[in-house]
Regions:
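Glycine-rich N-terminal segment of FAD-binding domains in flavoprotein oxidoreductases
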Residues: 8-101, 113-119
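Short, acidic, Ser/Thr-enriched surface-loop or helix-capping motifs
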Residues: 69, 106, 137
Length: 167
């Protein structure tokens, strides 16, 4: 058991924490777990990303999978830090449209919390710049969703705090 907290350091909750490194490890964890919550890098306030039974920390699923240098579209695993995106792509002339108050938020956490930055009044929140997401749902299926395909799941997931499945 590990003791976890959010960014505010309170409350501290004892939980079993698993940190998968691959899709196959994640699927195995999900198949054998009834009660869990996904967690990014723990930068949410409060205890929103902690479950007393099982917390699945996604920070090791942190790979860039594809990048289009013309459009700037990035496909990445949910554990990638915004800091890594900035460090990798700023030298190429690209910067995320929306960043949170800390660059140590994961991509999945930014989606799950639908973070906003100082430009919220102009550009909106992080979810405005997400083209599609793959979700591990409660049936242990991987479902791709977008504004046009499985759109309800897409909109429920952006800002859904991890309750629709694991990004």
């Amino acid at each position: 058991m590990n003791e976890l907290s959010g960014w505010g350091r309170f409350p501290k909750i004892k939980t079993r924490e698993l940190t998968p490194q691959s899709e196959s490890e994640l699927v195995e964890i999900l198949r054998n777990s009834d009660s869990y919550i996904p967690r990014g890098n723990g930068r949410s306030y409060g205890d929103s990303a902690i479950n007393k039974d099982l917390t699945i920390t996604m920070t090791r699923m942190n790979r860039f999978l594809q990048w289009n240098h013309e459009s700037g579209e990035l496909v990445a695993e949910s554990g990638v830090l915004i800091a890594d995106i900035i460090d990798t792509f700023l030298p190429k002339g690209w910067f995320p449209y929306v960043t949170a108050g800390t660059k140590f938020v994961t991509l999945g956490g930014a989606i799950a919390c639908d973070v906003h930055g100082k430009n919220h009044h102009k550009d909106g929140s992080f979810g405005n710049f997400v083209n599609w997401i793959e979700i591990f749902n409660d049936k242990n299926e991987i479902v791709r969703c977008s504004p046009d395909k499985n759109s309800e799941l897409f909109h429920w997931t952006i800002g859904g705090m991890g309750l629709t499945g694991v990004i």
